[in-house]
Amino acid sequence: MLPLVVDGLGFSVREQWLLKDVSFSLGAHDRTFIVGPNGAGKSILLKICHGLLSPTTGTVRWASGSFREQRQRQAMVFQKPVLLRRSARANVEYALSVRGVAKKDARERADRVLEATGLTAIAHRPARVLSGGEQQRLVLARAWALRPQVLFLDEPAAHLDPAATAAIEDVIQQVSNAGSKIIMVTHDLGQVRRLADEVLFLHQGQLLEQAASGDFLAHAKSQEARAFVEGQLLW
């Protein structure tokens, strides 16, 4: 289904343009991170690419498949975990049942991802009583179990302590190594250094740079991107 081609994308609310003429193309293999200051339009762009929002102008095109087929090949994890009032295991198995996976296969897939994410010992516990880091690992495990070609992540480690963040990043690395394309929003340049292959930099709804992560961090071209990398405040 890749590459993903975004052309002339705009998004407005009550005549205020939150994204303006955004264009880029993403290949199948790199981990792509969308970065920028608060209010830059990062999460909106992610939701449009996933099909949760419709653009005001422009197009989002995948290489192949109908809209339904494209959505079946994607998964998304939000900053705040969305969990059912069920056990951790049941949360994973239910997502698989919705996708039409047979019960036996769903159990086996759930076993694999719960083990890989370090959640086997607490798989029987109600999902909503888990810690914040455990809940976020669970929603990542649930998404991974779907075997997405593309996994969208909206600041999955926001507000977590360093140990929980490291666990989340380990899962992201595993999902990437298993073959999923990662498209992730973050404000954390440390995460960019540790995980990203490619960076899209947004500022005030405009895409100012698309570059390899090392080039972006060391040699950002725009004044705004350089200021962001240096830790200056942007608005």
Where are these regions (language model features)?
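A short, surface-exposed alpha-helical micro-motif characterized by mixed small hydrophobic
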Residues: 192-194
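H-loop/switch region of ABC-family ATPase nucleotide-binding domains
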Residues: 186-187
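Catalytic Walker B motif of ABC-type/P-loop ATPase nucleotide-binding domains
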Residues: 151-154
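Conserved ABC ATPase signature
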Residues: 126-130, 134
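Conserved ABC ATPase "signature" region
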Residues: 104-122
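Helix-to-loop junction immediately C-terminal to a conserved catalytic motif
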Residues: 50
